[in-house]
Curated annotation (Swiss-Prot):
Catalysed reactions, semicolon-separated: 1,6-anhydro-N-acetyl-beta-muramate + ATP + H2O = N-acetyl-D-muramate 6-phosphate + ADP + H(+)
Span of the signal peptide: none
Entry protein name: Anhydro-N-acetylmuramic acid kinase
Keyword annotations: ATP-binding, Carbohydrate metabolism, Kinase, Nucleotide-binding, Transferase
Source organism (scientific name): Klebsiella pneumoniae (strain 342)
Summary of the function given for this chain in its UniProt record: Catalyzes the specific phosphorylation of 1,6-anhydro-N-acetylmuramic acid (anhMurNAc) with the simultaneous cleavage of the 1,6-anhydro ring, generating MurNAc-6-P. Is required for the utilization of anhMurNAc either imported from the medium or derived from its own cell wall murein, and thus plays a role in cell wall recycling.
Positions contributing to ATP binding: 12-19
EC category: transferase
Similarity comment text for this entry: Belongs to the anhydro-N-acetylmuramic acid kinase family.
Pfam families: AnmK
Length: 374
């Protein structure tokens, strides 16, 4: 079983940057050693958003974006390697999630698409890449998501305490860690995605820092109930979703039924939508003693306060307090999944994704031997 240094690369639905993490991994530990966030150029971000909202494009446009993202991921990895004085031979593999542009786990031909050519990453970094993690799970009848609960269980499960790990990225998802029971995990709905989309359209800001704008508003109950009536929220777990569903067009559809709404009130209502849909799923799952929050939403004081209020009797804290960086959690998870793939170990949890069996995930893109590199 190979152990050593792995790099994880994550570009999530929030599109707030590319997270790159270096970790030492073996069967007993995952020790984070360094990290950085690499910016996504605005034109690329706009192209990704357009695809996720169903805008048509040619195969040539998709191919070019796939290549450009692959180079961008490679640049992000190379920046971390320069920062840490690493040679390609110092790193066993890179685990790259890719950028999800479509995720449709229902229907007669379930599918998911992550772009960012892994061949580009392997060629330009000189390091073996493991990518395309989700489709093997879908081939076995699973949702292809979420995959991070397996990592949560490995690092954050407690022998006697009933815990849940909540990741509030663009989409929010939970992992239920109950001693003696199979791990469960699923998406709860929008996390930061609609909050970020609204403030971007209204103020040109990428996110609502410290929930300052939302805190100036009041919750619009009719709008909140209207959004909560979306049938997706009533679907049974396990379930998954993404920007192809909960996007700005979804929000516009609901806002079109009202007039004269103040921007800060809409922002406050979107924050409440995130908090309510998360807390409802926590309670439906039987609740927990401790809710460990990671992702960008863990730095949103309004969301954290509302979760604590909606979940009395539950200790709401961050994964940082448990020793794992909440900002780097998902990138760490894909470094760990790359290690499992190379070790021939399953990376999915059928109790989470609904797959018929546990399986090794991903495809391997080997680096050229050092003597073959120019």
């Amino acid at each position: 079983m190979r152990s050593g240094r792995f790099i994880g690369v994550m570009s999530g639905t929030s599109l707030d940057g590319i997270d790159v993490v270096l970790a030492a991994i073996n069967e007993n530990i995952v020790a984070q050693q360094a990290s950085l966030t690499w910016p996504i150029p605005h034109p690329i971000k706009e192209e990704i958003l357009a695809i996720c909202q169903g805008q048509s494009l040619t195969l040539s446009q998709l191919g070019r974006l796939d290549t450009r993202l692959g180079r961008l991921f490679a640049d992000a990895v190379l920046a971390l390697m320069r920062q840490e004085n690493l040679k390609p031979t110092d790193v066993i593999a890179i685990g790259c999630h890719g950028q999800t542009v479509w995720h449709e786990p229902q229907g007669d031909a379930p599918h998911t698409l992550q772009i960012g050519d892994n061949n580009q990453i392997a060629a330009h970094t000189g390091v073996t890449v493991v990518g395309d993690f989700r489709r093997r799970d879908m081939a076995l009848g699973g949702q292809g998501a979420p995959l991070v609960p397996a990592f949560h269980h490995a690092l954050l499960a407690h022998p006697i305490e009933r815990r849940m790990v909540l990741n509030i990225g663009g989409i929010a998802n939970v992992s239920l860690l109950v001693p003696g029971q199979p791990v469960r995990g699923y998406d709860t709905g929008p996390g930061n995605m609609l909050l970020d989309a609204w403030i971007w359209r209204q103020q040109g800001k990428p996110y609502d820092k410290d929930a300052q704008w939302a805190s100036e508003g009041k919750v619009l109950l009719p709008l909140l109930q209207d959004m909560l009536s979306d049938p997706w929220f009533a679907l049974p777990a396990p379930k998954s979703t993404g920007r192809e569903y909960f996007n700005y067009g979804w929000l516009e559809k609901h806002l079109a039924r009202y007039s004269g709404l103040r921007g800060q009130d809409v922002q406050a209502t979107l924050a409440e939508l995130t908090a309510v849909t998360i807390s409802e799923q926590v309670l439906l799952s039987g609740g927990c003693e401790r809710l460990l929050v990671c992702g960008g939403g863990a730095r949103n004081p309004l969301l954290m306060a509302r979760l604590a209020a909606l979940l009395p009797g539950t200790e709401v804290s961050t994964t940082d307090e448990a020793g794992i960086s909440g900002d780097d959690m998902e990138a760490l998870a894909f470094a760990w999944l790359a290690w499992r793939t190379l070790a021939g170990l399953p990376g999915n949890l059928p109790s989470v994704t609904g797959a018929s069996e546990a399986t090794v995930l991903g495809a391997i893109f080997p680096a050229n031997p050092p003597q073959n590199r120019s």
